[in-house]
Amino acid sequence: MTKPTAEALKKPYLLIDTANDTLSLAVIADGKVLSSFSEAVFRDMAARLQPEMQNVLQSAQMDWPELGGILFNQGPGSFTSIRIGLAAAKALELSLGLKVYGLNGMQALAHPHTGQGRDVTVLLEAVGTDIYTQSFDENAKPHADAITQSLPEALDRAP
C-alpha cells in the first residue's frame, strides 16, 4: 500500500481503525475531521463496522463516491481485528474503486510529538503484560519495526 499525496488528502477520506477492541472511524478532508465515531465494541467489530461506516459518512453529509479513498490502520494490534478492517477496506476498493492506504498506527501516534530535535518512542498495550514498542527519529521515521516486549525491556531499550 502506497501513501497518498498531500494534494490527494484534500479530498474526503474514510479512516478505519480496527487494530484493537475499539472501532474508530472518521471522515476527514483537507486536514479537518468532518465526522467521527469511536466505541469499544470488543467481539462485535465485524457486525458493527459496516453500519457505523455508513453512519459516519451520513454525519459528514457524504456518500461513497465522494471519497478520495480509505486510510487504514495496519497495526500493530489484534490480528483478527486488523483483518476485519482490512477486509472491509479491500471490499470498498474492489466494489467502488476507492484507493486503500495503509497507515502505521505507531507512527501516527508519534507524529504529533516529532520535530523537537529528539527521538520519540511509542508504547501500546499488547497481550497480557506485554507492550508494543517502536522508536522514531525527530521526523517520525521509524528506527526499526514495532516489537512486542515486557515494559522493563522496553524502558531499558528506549532512547
What kind of feature is each model-predicted range?
Residues 13-15, 71-73, 81, 119-123:
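Short glycine-aspartate micro-motif
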Residues 3-9, 32, 44, 99-159:
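Surface "functional belts" at beta-alpha junctions
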Residues 69-100:
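DPxDG-like acidic metal-binding loop motif
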Residues 48-51, 87, 91, 108:
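Short amphipathic alpha-helical face segments that pack within enzyme cores
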Residues 60-65, 94-103, 118:
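Phosphate-handling active-site elements
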